[in-house]
From Swiss-Prot:
Protein function: Forms part of the ribosomal stalk which helps the ribosome interact with GTP-bound translation factors.
NCBIfam families listed in its UniProt record: L11_bact (TIGR01632)
Superkingdom of source: Bacteria
Example of a GO biological process term: translation
Gene designation: rplK
Full protein name: Large ribosomal subunit protein uL11
Keywords (A to Z) from UniProt: Methylation, Ribonucleoprotein, Ribosomal protein, RNA-binding, rRNA-binding
InterPro entries: Ribosomal_uL11, Ribosomal_uL11_bac-typ, Ribosomal_uL11_C, Ribosomal_uL11_C_sf, Ribosomal_uL11_CS, Ribosomal_uL11_N, Ribosomal_uL11_N_sf
Assembly description: Part of the ribosomal stalk of the 50S ribosomal subunit. Interacts with L10 and the large rRNA to form the base of the stalk. L10 forms an elongated spine to which L12 dimers bind in a sequential fashion forming a multimeric L10(L12)X complex.
Amino acid sequence: MAKKIAGYVKLQIPAGKATPAPPVGPALGQHGVNIMGFCKEFNERTAKDAGLVIPVVITVYADRSFSFITKTPPAAVLLKKACKIESGSGKPNKDKVAKITMDEVRKIAEQKMPDLNAASVDAATKMIAGTARSMGIVVVE
């Protein structure tokens, strides 16, 4: 029989840098999970993605054990990395902070495809291009 699920915890943690400090410690502590066990396992799984923020969904079971699924980094993080910028524009309609080519947007869309609610890579590319525009990044053909 399957284990009884006590709850889910969704976090965004820098790859390879999970520590028992907030936000990880308090979020897992209230469910009674072994925080160090999670941190070690997460850091091992995400060591290759250093520098990126990794969303993780932790499933906590009634016996206080856990399992977790890592997702692809948020589109905004991937766009900032591709454009080599610190943050998006505060006024995206007026101030443009960078330019990105459609090919680069397509590569990001292909990387994000498993986590996006899109039927095709073209649809995913449009989603990522929209995110770029809302950050003040100009998408050039």
